[in-house]
């Protein structure tokens, strides 16, 4: 029996890394693997526990077929190791921190994937992005405007194939909704 590919997407600052870290032990209890992405940024960079590689290393890995999925976003390259296909074939559920812009290509390769869109109230997201200190306020405002359009388009375009998790409140609540969705499906936890 094949496992499920669970594709977590959401804007920068929505709390994807925090959600994955908080849910990790309970996901492991369910036999769900969380994929460690390969990213062309320093392994010491703040954020997720990704494998940091140089752009040259990434290009070599990609040419050698090391990735099941790969994409570029925000000036970086992201890769999902090919081993996820072995895990899925063995019946394991696999959770990927994915890309909203790469969703169509991912759905093409994995038509039965479960898409989880992590959202957050715009005011909360603004505060999180400001607190990170990576961008100027004008860039943050532009990002927020793009995010609002992108989220609306995603929800309109994917409807029943997309489960929305609101991460504006306590993280523990979002973890419970995530687990409910994985255990019981979309409709049980809407």
Curated annotation (Swiss-Prot):
Pathway the protein takes part in: Metabolic intermediate biosynthesis; 5-phospho-alpha-D-ribose 1-diphosphate biosynthesis; 5-phospho-alpha-D-ribose 1-diphosphate from D-ribose 5-phosphate (route II): step 3/3
Keyword Cytoplasm: no
Keyword hit for DNA repair: no
Keywords: ATP-binding, Nucleotide-binding, Transferase
Superkingdom of the organism of origin: Bacteria
One MF term in the entry's GO annotations: ATP binding
Amino-acid positions noted as binding ATP in the UniProt annotation, renumbered to this chain: 10-17
Function per UniProt: Catalyzes the phosphorylation of ribose 1,5-bisphosphate to 5-phospho-D-ribosyl alpha-1-diphosphate (PRPP).
Family stated for the protein in its record: Belongs to the ribose 1,5-bisphosphokinase family.
Alphabetized NCBIfam families for the sequence: phosphon_PhnN (TIGR02322), PRK10078.1 (NF007485)
PANTHER family per the UniProt record, alphabetical: GUANYLATE KINASE-RELATED, RIBOSE 1,5-BISPHOSPHATE PHOSPHOKINASE PHNN
HAMAP family named in the record: PhnN (MF_00836)
Protein name, per record: Ribose 1,5-bisphosphate phosphokinase PhnN
Taxonomic source organism: Pseudomonas fluorescens (strain SBW25)
Gene: phnN
């Amino acid at each position: 029996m094949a496992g499920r590919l669970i594709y977590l997407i959401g804007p920068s600052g929505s709390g994807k890394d925090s959600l994955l870290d908080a849910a990790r032990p309970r996901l492991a209890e369910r036999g769900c693997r969380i994929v460690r992405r390969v990213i062309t940024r320093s392994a010491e960079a703040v954020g997720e526990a990704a494998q940091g590689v140089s752009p040259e290393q990434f290009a070599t890995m990609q040419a050698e077929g090391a990735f099941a999925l790969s994409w570029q976003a925000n000036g970086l390259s992201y890769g999902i190791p090919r081993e996820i296909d072995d895990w899925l074939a063995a019946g394991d559920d696999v959770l990927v921190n994915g890309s909203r812009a790469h969703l169509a290509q991912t759905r093409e390769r994995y038509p039965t994937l479960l898409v989880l869109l992590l959202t957050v109230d715009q005011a909360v997201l603004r505060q999180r992005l400001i607190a990170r200190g990576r961008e100027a306020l004008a860039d943050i405002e532009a990002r927020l405007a793009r995010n609002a359009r992108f989220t609306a388009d995603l929800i309109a375009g994917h409807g029943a194939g997309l489960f929305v998790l609101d991460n504006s409140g306590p993280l523990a609540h979002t973890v419970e909704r995530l687990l409910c969705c994985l255990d019981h499906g979309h409709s049980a936890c809407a």
